[in-house]
Amino acid sequence: MLGVIADDFTGASDIASFLVENGLSTVQMNGVPTQSLNSKVDAIVISLKSRSNPVNEAIEQSLRAYQWLKENGCTQFYFKYCSTFDSTAKGNIGPVTDALLDELNEDFTVITPALPVNGRTIFNGYLFVGDVLLSESGMKNHPITPMVDANLMRLMDAQAKGKTGLVAYADVIKGASRVQECFAELKAQGYRYAVVDAVDNSQLEVLAEAVADFKLVTGGSGLGAYMAARLSGGKKGTNAFTPTKGKTVVLSGSCSVMTNKQVEKYREKAPHFQLDVEQAIHNENYIEQLYQWVIANLDSEFAPMVYATVPPDALKAIQHQFGVDQASHAIENTFAKLAAKLKQYGVTNFITAGGETSSIVVQELGFTGFHIGKQIAPGVPWLKAVEEDIFLALKSGNFGKEDFFEYAQGMFL
C-alpha cells in the first residue's frame, strides 16, 4: 500500500486525484488521524500544513504521518510537494526529506516536482513553468515562498544536509535500467538525492519503473500518477462522483498569475466582493458583513465570490503596509471563519483557490477525511467529506484554466 505525506491540502487532493484516475482506491485524511483506518484502500494520502511553518513542526508532523501510515499497512512512502517546489533556502522540503530517509534507514531518494500536464518540466535540473524558468515565472512573486532560483540542485543543497546530483534527460530517455545505473553512480559519489529530468510524461513513466523498489520517493503529483499506474496494472479509475447542486460559494486567496486571470474572468459573470485587508485586521464585525453579503447573493446564477486575489504590485503594497505575516493571517482567518458560518447556514459546495486558504478552510470546517471525486482540472478533483454531504474543490494557485470557477459549477448534478 502506498502512503503519501503531502505538505499542504491542495497538494494532497492533487496527488489523490491522480492516484484515483490511475486505478488506486484512495482516501485523503486531513491531518494525522487519531484512529486506525477502517476501510480497505490501495493508497492513503495525509494532508499536512507543513510547507511554510517552522522546520521542527514540519518534521514532527511528517514523522507522525509516516508512523501512522506505517501502522496502517503502508510499505512505500511518497513525500508530495508542489510542482513549483515552493521552498526557499529556509524551506522544509530538504529537512523533511532528510528526516524521512533517516526514519526509514535509507540513504538516497529522488527529487522530481515535474508535472508536464500542467507545464511543470525539468531540464538539466532546472524547473520550468510553461516555457520560462521557475525564477522568471509568477512564482518569483509568491507571498510566502518567492522562487528566485530555478536550479533544483542548488535549491535542495541550500536546505538539506546531503548533496544533490542530476540524472539528465539524455540518460532518462535510455530507460529505467540506465536511470538505476545513474542512481548507483551518484550514491557511490556520495550524493543523497537525485533531481531527475522530465520534459514530458514518458520520462515520468521511466522513472516510476526505476524507483519501484524505493521505500521513499519525493516529488509532485506527476510521478505519483505513473507509480499508481504501475501498482494498479494500468487500470483506470471509474465511478468518480460529482457534487449535488446546492448552495455554493467561491473563496479565492491565491495571488498567482492564473488565479488573477480566473478571478478577473469570473467577476464578469458572478457577484463578487474584494476582501479588504485593513478591515479584516481591525474590524471585528467584518466577517459578519461578508457573511450577510454572501447569503444575500446565494441565489445568483453563479455562486458569489469573496476574493483577496490581487496582482503582484498590489500584493507588495499590502505586505509593505501590514507585514507579510499579519496580512496572510488576517486573510486566512477571515476565510476560515466565513466558511464555518456559511456551512452552518447551509452552504454545501465550497470552491477555494490557494493552498493556504484551502488548508485553513478545511481545518476550520473540521472534516477528518475525504472521498476523491471527478477531476475538474488536472490535479484538482471534487472532494466529499467523509462525515457529511459537503463538497469541496480546492485549487492550488496556478492550476486550472481561466474559466475554472464557472466550469467547476457546471459539473453539479
Swiss-Prot record:
Domain of life, per lineage: Bacteria
Disulfide bridge positions per record: none
Top EC class for this record: transferase
EC number annotated for this UniProt entry: 2.7.1.217
Keyword Oxidoreductase: no
Any Pfam family hit: NBD_C
MF terms (GO), sorted A to Z: ATP binding; kinase activity
Reactions it catalyzes: 3-dehydro-L-erythronate + ATP = 3-dehydro-4-O-phospho-L-erythronate + ADP + H(+); 3-dehydro-D-erythronate + ATP = 3-dehydro-4-O-phospho-D-erythronate + ADP + H(+)
Annotated ATP binding sites: S254, G354, G355, E356, T357, G397
Alphabetical keyword list: ATP-binding, Carbohydrate metabolism, Kinase, Nucleotide-binding, Transferase
Keyword Secreted appears in the UniProt entry: no
Family: Belongs to the four-carbon acid sugar kinase family.
Functional summary from the UniProt entry: Catalyzes the ATP-dependent phosphorylation of 3-oxo-tetronate to 3-oxo-tetronate 4-phosphate.
Protein name according to UniProt: 3-oxo-tetronate kinase
Organismal lineage: Bacteria, Pseudomonadati, Pseudomonadota, Gammaproteobacteria, Pasteurellales
